[in-house]
A protein has these predicted regions:
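Mg2+-dependent endonuclease catalytic cores in nucleic-acid-processing enzymes, primarily RNase H-like
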Residues: 1-90, 134-146
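Charge-patterned, long linear interaction tracts outside catalytic cores
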Residues: 67-133
């Protein structure tokens, strides 16, 4: 049995209750993807947009590997980027409503990968010493989307 050393939970709607129930178990991060982006606010409309873009960059840089899962790969390829409707130059990933309008189900597995990358990067930022002390690595992180 492998226990995750960090878990990221989307705290919007259903995830909020899940987070409240499990946060006392250890390294659990609540993530509100509708908040402002943490980096480059001039480039992204919301944190969700930033996190999806960072995942895109990780694939381009070949710094991430995923399971050979047709459903996951399909979900990752379905979501589109565009510019925010405000007329700004900010990038925005296609929202859940827009996906539904296209007849596409919510990309739950892909969202989970996005959150796991967030957990990895956030944990790594704490410090190299902390990283080494806790022995965190990509394979030891879990992801859930409620």
């Amino acid at each position: 049995d492998r226990k995750p050393q960090a878990t990221a939970i989307d705290v919007i709607v259903l995830g909020s209750g899940v987070y409240d129930q499990v946060k006392h178990y250890g390294r659990v991060m609540g993530v509100n993807v509708s908040e402002k982006p943490s980096n480059r606010p001039e480039m992204f409309a919301r944190m969700r947009d930033e996190l999806w873009w960072k995942l895109r960059e990780a694939f381009q840089e070949r710094t991430i590997k995923i399971p050979n899962d047709d459903e996951l790969i399909g979900e990752l390829n379905l979501v589109k980027f565009n510019f925010a409707r405000t007329g700004s130059e900010k990038l925005k990933v296609e929202g859940k409503r827009e996906l539904r309008d296209r007849g596409v189900a919510s990309p739950n597995k892909a969202d989970a990968v996005v959150l796991s990358e967030y957990a990895i990067n956030r944990t790594a930022m704490r410090s190299y010493v902390d990283w080494r002390r806790h022995g965190l690595r990509r394979g030891s992180l879990s992801w859930k989307v409620a």
